[in-house]
Amino acid sequence: MQGHRIGYVRVSSFDQNPERQLEQTQVSKVFTDKASGKDTQRPQLEALLSFVREGDTVVVHSMDRLARNLDDLRRLVQKLTQRGVRIEFLKEGLVFTGEDSPMANLMLSVMGAFAEFERALIRERQREGIALAKQRGAYRGRKKALSDEQAATLRQRATAGEPKAQLAREFNISRETLYQYLRTDD
């Protein structure tokens, strides 16, 4: 049964170009998530999983665009292929159908493990770079949401009993950020 070719694209940040991932690839519909790969709650991935039917092919630029770790990758590939949906990874040149040979399953495991390893190396280099920048005094981290004066006012008003949700809205911060300010004294 010949179905539709459906694309899945994931970009980690809003400045990445999602079109680049499936350029020159014919697909009838594309689902695009702007979220981290480690976040398994991706609305467009969930929509794709609900949308695809037996005979369809899901086209993904590379394995690391679908999942950041081997367990999630295997689970998603198995979930799709058990429903009669093919999955095609362009960068790796691999297609999975559910009737895969032991060699294809080995390739899925090896390539998925390499993607996971590569991500771990990137995170390690990022941490090392931040540590070096901190030593040189060049890294200051994220800009604070509130000035010291605003933070002091926030603490006073929260201590006085004003509703925290109202304060968060007024200061234009999330409630989690509000609670972080209330936990710290700086």
UniProtKB/Swiss-Prot annotation:
Belongs to the site-specific recombinase resolvase family. It comes from Pseudomonas putida (Arthrobacter siderocapsulatus). It comes from the Bacteria. The lineage of its organism: Bacteria, Pseudomonadati, Pseudomonadota, Gammaproteobacteria, Pseudomonadales. The keyword DNA-binding applies. This is Transposons Tn4653 resolvase. Residues 164-183 bind DNA. GO terms for molecular function: DNA binding; DNA strand exchange activity. Residues 4-137 form the Resolvase/invertase-type recombinase catalytic domain. CDD domains: HTH_Hin_like, SR_ResInv. GO terms for biological process: DNA integration. The keyword Isomerase does not apply. SMART domains: Resolvase.
